[in-house]
Amino acid sequence: MPPKEDWEKYQKPVDTEEENDKNPPPLDEGDIELLKSYATGPYARELAAIKEDTEAVLKRINDTVGIKESDTGLAPISFWDVAADRQRMSEEQPLQVARCTKIIENEQSAEKNAYVINLKQIAKFVVSLGERVSPTDIEEGMRVGCDRNKYAIQLPLPPKIDPSVTMMQVEEKPDVTYGDVGGCKEQIERLREVVELPLLSPERFVKLGIDPPKGIMLYGPPGTGKTLCARAVANRTDATFIRVIGSELVQKYVGEGARMVRELFEMARTKKACIIFFDEIDAIGGARFDDGAGGDNEVQRTMLELITQLDGFDPRGNIKVLFATNRPNTLDEALMRPGRIDRKVEFGLPDLEGRAHILRIHAKSMAIDKDIRWELIARLCPSQTGAELRSVCTEAGMFAIRARRRVATEKDFLDAVQKVVKGNQKFSSTADYMNMSS
């Protein structure tokens, strides 16, 4: 074996580049940006900026819209805060519902007032207010929440209202406008004077020193547009709209119908402006009589409560009341007097121009020929209501479907007139006296 000094000269010299490969230097920010730019197109930066702007706009829209409604009524899981909810539940103790029957005022300070509460089936207590309640929040006769230890008032509660009464409030506005109601131009103007003008321009009535009308009766044959006009009113105004069917107030047990009417007006008084629409009022508003058996006593009690709420000892407030019926001659005189019902609007049969307008309204969404003579079809439908004219349009569409055509022609409408008007005369909903007068 050769000595060490001999074979060291044959050893391959160490390359500094290989050492650098084994221990590479760390990358700085410029190198990282350069690596990120590899395999990217010329518009990558612009697309990334547009994506960030889109996400920011979408986030603002979601924050503005809020939580979407779900079938379960729960918020999305991303909005849950279980820890905070548990802490809040541990801090807040369950309360007992009581009624404040009397307020004992203190001459020195209102904060030292005493309150007499009545706990149902327990006893009456004289208590004070909790730390979170102001003396101005509590009134005599209202429901309050009390703690279980000292019975101190911790929370003012809203009045108790039957859920069936709460469900009468119309949440979503109907899609019917005044332009969708044909043949009722004069009736719509009189209706808007009573409903919309006092809500939009109350100063006119104040200057004249008169109270605006608060009750209106819509009467006429079936199918002339009474309920349709009420739906248009609900679409037009921003006031709370409550729809009541007369038969809903006819209850089995004594006093239930009167209680529902009372709670209905209590709920209406809590609103800034409210419109109550009683459809088919003849179900509870018939003339009072004694049949000897007492079968209609409960219905009469319900009507008496309605009469009292309309114009009784307590003021009605900013509540407009609409009634609709096709039998005005059967209603009680006390219900029809001015002060309770200030204006009566008759919905009669439409004239020739009104019938043509109604046909155009119902045919607006149909696939029809352009050269249909609506005045001719309207002239062939004398003494017909708006509902019967709508049936004519529906039957014309059925004739077109039966013939496997994509559009309805004038002949289809003429055949529909023959079927609806001529074939259903014995089932006509028009009153006899109106047929005679026409």
From Swiss-Prot:
Where, by residue number, does ATP bind? G220, P221, P222, G223, T224, G225, K226, T227
Write out the similarity annotation. Belongs to the AAA ATPase family.
Q: Which residues carry this modification: Phosphoserine?
A: S90
Any GO BP annotation: proteasome-mediated ubiquitin-dependent protein catabolic process
Question: MF terms per GO, please?
Answer: ATP binding; ATP hydrolysis activity; proteasome-activating activity
**Disulfide topology:** none
> Main role?
The 26S proteasome is involved in the ATP-dependent degradation of ubiquitinated proteins. The regulatory (or ATPase) complex confers ATP dependency and substrate specificity to the 26S complex.
**Any idea what this protein is called?**
26S proteasome regulatory subunit 7 homolog
A single GO CC term, please?
Answer: nucleus
Subcellular location per UniProt equals: Cytoplasm; Nucleus
Q: Which UniProt keywords apply?
A: ATP-binding, Cytoplasm, Nucleotide-binding, Nucleus, Phosphoprotein, Proteasome
Gene3D superfamilies, A to Z: 1.10.8.60, Nucleic acid-binding proteins (2.40.50.140), P-loop containing nucleotide triphosphate hydrolases (3.40.50.300)
SUPFAM superfamilies for the chain = P-loop containing nucleoside triphosphate hydrolases
- Positions of region (Disordered): 1-31
Record's compositionally biased regions (Basic and acidic residues): 1-15
Species name: Schizosaccharomyces pombe (strain 972 / ATCC 24843) (Fission yeast)
Which Pfam family would be a valid example here?
A: AAA
Q: Which gene encodes it?
A: rpt1
Superkingdom: Eukaryota
